[in-house]
Amino acid sequence: PNYGEQKTSGLHYSGAFENGQAAMCNMGSWFLATMQKYNAEASANGVQPVNFGIVKYPHPDGAPAGSTLGTVTSLAINANSTKKEAAADFLNWCASEEAAEALAATGNFPAVSSDKTSEIIASTDGFPNDENSKEALKTTAVYLEMPLSDKASEIETILNTEHDAIMTESETVDEGIANMNEQVQAILG
């Protein structure tokens, strides 16, 4: 299906990828665990598993090969908590190598990464067997997908709206970029 049909039918991109309607899916690291689960449950669900692999993210000129995108997922302690010390202990554990290895064992990518966590991820059930997929785990730099800003949510709404307009051919790429720039600048002042 084209983008408009996919959007109006409610077909999620993971479904389009899983059923072969999309040849590739530009997704975050979390999608690996999604695909591993899909394949593990495929037989019981009466569908075929997907033979897939992963590759390194394309990088712009000037960025080292192996560069990728990342985002911030925050953990916090409620100021009104009666268990602040226990919460702080948990947060410290979350940032530890032990926690990174535990998360990697589930096929997910921890915030603290190392050669060891990459080896663990590559050894999880359902990880693609090809060398390119293993090589894709080796990154050289991680850049924020979106700069930290209290306006990030408003800006993302603009980006998504203009993306939809471009993908449904309601406007050209140049028009969409111009609209994004104008609307984002209005928010940033």
Indicate residue ranges for each PLM-predicted region.
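A residue-level marker of the well-folded mature domains of exported/periplasmic proteins
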Residues: 8, 14-19, 58-61, 77, ...
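Conserved N-terminal structural module of periplasmic/extracytoplasmic solute-binding proteins
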Residues: 43-47, 61-62, 102, 161, ...
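Extracytoplasmic ligand-binding clamshell segments of periplasmic binding protein
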Residues: 1-41, 85, 176
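Extracytoplasmic/periplasmic substrate-recognition and gating elements
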Residues: 40-108
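Long, aromatic- and glycine/proline-rich binding clefts that accommodate carbohydrate-like moieties
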Residues: 52-56, 105-161, 165
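Solvent-exposed, acidic/flexible segments
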Residues: 63-70, 80-87, 148-156, 170-173, ...
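Non-transmembrane alpha-helical segments in soluble domains
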Residues: 14, 18, 26, 78, ...
